[in-house]
From Swiss-Prot:
Entry-linked CDD domains: Cyt_c_Oxidase_III
Name of the coding gene: COIII
Residues passing through the membrane, by range: 41-61, 81-101, 133-153, 161-181, 196-216, 238-258
InterPro entries (UniProt xref): Cyt_c/ubiquinol_Oxase_su3, Cyt_c_oxase_su3_dom, Cyt_c_oxidase-like_su3, Cyt_c_oxidase_su3-like_sf, Cyt_c_oxidase_su3_a-hlx
Source taxonomy: Eukaryota, Metazoa, Echinodermata, Eleutherozoa, Echinozoa
Known catalytic reactions: 4 Fe(II)-[cytochrome c] + O2 + 8 H(+)(in) = 4 Fe(III)-[cytochrome c] + 2 H2O + 4 H(+)(out)
Assembly mode: Component of the cytochrome c oxidase (complex IV, CIV), a multisubunit enzyme composed of a catalytic core of 3 subunits and several supernumerary subunits. The complex exists as a monomer or a dimer and forms supercomplexes (SCs) in the inner mitochondrial membrane with ubiquinol-cytochrome c oxidoreductase (cytochrome b-c1 complex, complex III, CIII).
Protein name, UniProt field: Cytochrome c oxidase subunit 3
Membrane topology reported for the UniProt record: Multi-pass membrane protein
Record-listed E.C. numbers: 7.1.1.9
GO BP: any one term: mitochondrial electron transport, cytochrome c to oxygen
Biological function: Component of the cytochrome c oxidase, the last enzyme in the mitochondrial electron transport chain which drives oxidative phosphorylation. The respiratory chain contains 3 multisubunit complexes succinate dehydrogenase (complex II, CII), ubiquinol-cytochrome c oxidoreductase (cytochrome b-c1 complex, complex III, CIII) and cytochrome c oxidase (complex IV, CIV), that cooperate to transfer electrons derived from NADH and succinate to molecular oxygen, creating an electrochemical gradient over the inner membrane that drives transmembrane transport and the ATP synthase.
Source taxon at top rank: Eukaryota
Keywords: Membrane, Mitochondrion, Mitochondrion inner membrane, Translocase, Transmembrane, Transmembrane helix
């Protein structure tokens, strides 16, 4: 039967049910992990969830590239969806910054009426944090280079620039892990440690997600999935990565520099 509309009506798929089952397994596994220190169910649920995500997104890519299901109307809807997703991430960080300022602008007697609290040695903002700022800024430049190369039809330069972006994102994660290991305080050290590690850790998670997103785009670029006019998957990854860049600048300014 001919389709008389520009919308994509998805076919029946096992992936939503499989994803729900994997999420249930991970949640149940986390409960067991917290109470019995056994991680088997959590790991199995996590592996099933990763498998589900890979297969589901592979189907989406196939329908976009090889079946032509993603029309201009569908692309417009996905753009709105990505904007709403990034907006939800903004709300997350707004909550983290609210908690940070609530604790730092009027320190309570429990932490010595001082910020940072008594006994806390904050990290030097001009060492690893400043290096990480330079790394993320550079990754934003290389990502823009890759995007402009796609628009110009230069696939080779786009691959090179995207590879550099993925490498810089991985380097940022390694530096962040080293900073956490070497930090003179932990997440259990008063509200300072809690707000610091939750805010920077959540951002670090976004960097890992963004790096994975860009890595997929790298493979897709090498596989000639993107054209000069049809590359929303790349654009969505670029939007997300630039959002991560902006959040880091705010984190560096408020938590590392002002907060110290």
């Amino acid at each position: 039967m001919a389709i008389q509309h520009p919308y994509h009506l998805v076919d029946q798929s096992p992936w939503p049910l499989d994803g729900a089952f994997s999420g249930l397994m991970m949640t149940s596994g986390n409960v067991l992990w917290f109470h019995t220190q056994k991680t088997n169910l959590t790991l199995v649920g996590f592996l099933l969830l990763i498998t589900n995500m890979v297969n589901w997104w592979r189907d989406i890519i196939r329908k976009a590239n090889f079946q032509g299901s993603h029309t201009a109307i569908v692309n417009k809807g996905m753009r709105y969806g990505m904007i709403l997703f990034i907006t939800s991430e903004v709300c997350f960080f707004f909550a983290f910054f609210w908690a940070f300022f609530h604790s730092s602008l009027a320190p309570s007697v429990e932490i010595g009426v001082a910020w940072p609290p008594s006994g806390i040695t904050p990290l030097n903002p001009f060492l690893v944090p400043l290096l990480n700022t330079g790394v993320l800024l550079s990754s934003g430049v290389t990502l823009s280079w890759s995007h402009h190369s796609i628009l110009a039809g230069n696939r080779t330069e786009s691959i090179q620039a995207l590879f550099l972006t993925v490498a810089l994102g991985s380097y940022f994660t390694a530096l962040q892990a080293w900073e956490y290991i070497d930090a003179p305080f932990t997440i259990a050290d008063s509200v300072y440690g809690s707000t610091f590690f939750v805010a920077t850790g959540f951002h670090g998670l976004q960097v890992i997600i963004g790096t994975t997103f860009l890595m997929v785009c790298l493979f897709r670029t090498a596989g000639r999935h993107f054209s000069t006019h049809h590359h929303f998957g790349f654009e969505a990854a670029a939007w997300y990565w630039h959002f991560v860049d902006v959040v880091w600048f705010v984190l560096y300014w408020l938590i590392y520099w002002w907060g110290a």
